[in-house]
Amino acid sequence: MFSRLRISHRAERRVRRLWANYGVFWLGAVLVGLVSVVYAKFIDFGFELFRGAVAYASWSPLIFTPIGAALAIGLTQKFFRGAEGSGIPQVIATLEDGRLSSSLLSLRIMLGKIVISFVGILCGFTIGREGPTVQIGASLMYAMRRGYRRSSQHIERQLALAGAAAGLAAAFNTPLAGVVFAIEELTRSFVSRNTGTLITAIIFSGVVALGLQGNYLYFGRIPAFNGFAWALIPALIVASVITGVAGGVFGWILLNVALWMPRPLFELRRTHPVYFAFFCGVAIAVIGLASRGTTFGSGYAEARGLLESHETLSPLYALLKFGALIASYLSGIPGGIFAPSLAIGAGLGNTMSLVTSSVPLPSLAALCMVGYLAAVTQSPITSFVIVMEMIDGHQMVMPLMAVALLATQISRTITPSFYHTLAHRFRSSSRLPALSSPSSI
């Protein structure tokens, strides 16, 4: 009897040890997948409400987009400092300086990211949910440190890194991209002991996401470009140059606001961010109406339509979307640039298709999508893998890789890394820098 009790006690201790070593982490990864799916549905619901309002009264964005912008920035400034913008620079900053984790990866920040980005998409802002999902995943996993009896800075960093990678993978349904993103963008190094942790988190969160949403391709399947064609080479070169320059200029504009913004507007942004956000909302509404509504939101529908060859867009779509994204990000509202960047890239491919018929529109759109995303993030491998996994365009692997690499190199001649420059500003500032502050963007 006593031996049976000893065995039972030993088994209980083993179960507790297994839970302490693995259970907390697995639970966190499952929660990341669950929250990512709910957040995606939440954002989609918000944009459907916006589209319904615009269908009822096409002029309505002129009223509620500026008011919503002012409300969103007011709430962010007062309650959710650190939730501004994409969220990826914040995650990078915490991985490089663990002292920032409690400020930038808290559950309060996660809540603010979800709520304020919902307000933004509800008002038609040009923002995506993928970047915020990275910070949401990192914040949620970082909170799981409380489940460990003895936490450490190493454990906290591993949790945040795994949560960020799992968040991106769940947002795009691109498991491989989650691992590559963590290695190339978040840590800028390959550490073998991280890979098991990353893959485990991505598996658990991915299973939850697939269970709730089913197996799907983010942008569907694009028509194949049959075999290699010499006509693809000049298109590839032109796409690389156009997207590399456009992505580099985008980063330069956001990182050097003080150099180009008129002084009165610059001072308004610094001293009265809520008023500045109101005017950003006016700009977004005007651009949206000028584009007949195509620049509102993330741009997912427009990009997918171009990839499937059933969308007709203005040659100026990419330029108008570019302006709407600049205004959205300068306002300081929580929201990502991944999906809007893909939409801008697809728009550039649409413009290229007007001057050449040798390459199908879906192929041009895919090339410009990967090129522009790579130029903005300066993470060519991540960009190539994301687009490749999202569109099931395996027949275009080599061209996508080439464009991503060339566009990144061109972008680097114009501006430094967008995310890492912002992360450096978070680290070097003695206080939390809001993106509405000129010191942070």
Model-inferred region functions:
Residues 1-441:
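Alpha-helical transmembrane segments and immediately membrane-proximal extracytoplasmic
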